[in-house]
Amino acid sequence: MSESDETKSISSLISSSSSSRPKKYICTYEGCDKAYNRPSLLEQHLRTHSNDRPYKCTVEDCDKAFFRKSHLETHIVSHSEKKPFHCSVCGKGVNSRQHLKRHEITHTKSFKCTFENCQEAFYKHQSLRHHILSVHEKTLTCKQCNKVFTRPSKLAQHKLKHHGGSPAYQCDHPGCFKNFQTWSVLQFHIKQSHPKLKCPKCGKGCVGKKGLSSHMLSHDDSTMIKIWTCDYCDVGKFAKKNELVEHYNIFHDGNIPDDLLKETEVKKLENLLDQGSKLNNLHELETEKLKVEEDEEDEEDSLDEKRSDVRSDSMSAQRSIKSFTASLEGSKSVSKLISNSGKKINCPKNNCDRMFSREYDLRRHLKWHDDNLQRIESFLNSIEKEETPEGEPLVKKARMDLLPNETSVISR
């Protein structure tokens, strides 16, 4: 036997011996029934209850600390520009084996067909569903000419074009027998007329029985590969990252590993800052909104009101954070601003070129500024409560960029 074979044999024996040991080292914390076969593993677990993080990063200006030495070693790599682990498919570099495993799974076809003697697999769950409907269940086959389609919409279009007949889409809600020409109109009808059906496992609302049946496949272990694994226990294996985060919150007292915490919190703040650099059309959007409000203020039927709400929500979502990056000018009173009747009134905030002819419009516009400042203030306060070293510079930058110290110029 060669030296390498002997080493592998010894390693397998050690692993086998370790896994067969009785788990007699039990956690003494109330409500926790975890048990381990080594005292060192129990000691490691107890740190998650006491939040004792003995392994501290030695890099300057980094205060990170960890429960495990392996976590610290992985973190140290993040300070280096070199990426020790590289994808065998595309060559992308990452910091750890776990990150590499998560990345490489994106190159694999995770959703496999469960029908006997079928080896097909797909990158997306939707593609698997279309495959099952068209190939195995034959529900996407035209009964008149036997032509097979990959999507219900394609089959419906084919029937209307080549075979005529009544509308192809029928509502399957109990007691409803309405038919529709297109799939989108049917979906609109279901959303407006029938309540969503909740998934018994996750509570997600689904449109119709078919929508619920399709969603339930996402909970089927046989059709999904679970790539998100818990660092603390062998039970926690999930197909989605948010499910793993929820597992940490429920079963491990919210002790989320630093890589996941960094992704969820810091990314959220980065997205907020990105809004300010990408959206530069605030003036045109606000002008359009005011014009619509003035023209349609007196008469609007129910449909117009819905469209106005959607348009208003869309504009609100697109409002640029850039309008808050400059401090306010000196204390200009409204009376001074409108002293010359009939002239345009400028918004007193820097980097905002809006102009108004009425005091009412100016006040409403400035209230919009204040409301958004309060929203951003609330968000930054929530981030600071659970601030991490990675997130700290972003929070400070956001405060300097987004929240000026001066107060509003309008006295109410």
UniProtKB/Swiss-Prot annotation:
Main subcellular location: nucleus
Taxonomic lineage: Eukaryota, Fungi, Dikarya, Ascomycota, Saccharomycotina
SUPFAM superfamilies hit by this protein: beta-beta-alpha zinc fingers
GO molecular function: DNA-binding transcription factor activity; RNA polymerase II cis-regulatory region sequence-specific DNA binding; RNA polymerase II sequence-specific DNA-binding transcription factor recruiting activity; RNA polymerase III type 1 promoter sequence-specific DNA binding; zinc ion binding
Zinc fingers typed C2H2-type, residue spans: 25-49, 55-79, 85-107, 111-136, 140-162, 169-194, 197-219, 228-252, 345-369
UniProt name for this protein: Transcription factor IIIA
Stored SMART domains: ZnF_C2H2
Known role: Transcription factor required for transcription of 5S rRNA by RNA polymerase III.
Biased segments, Acidic residues type: 293-303
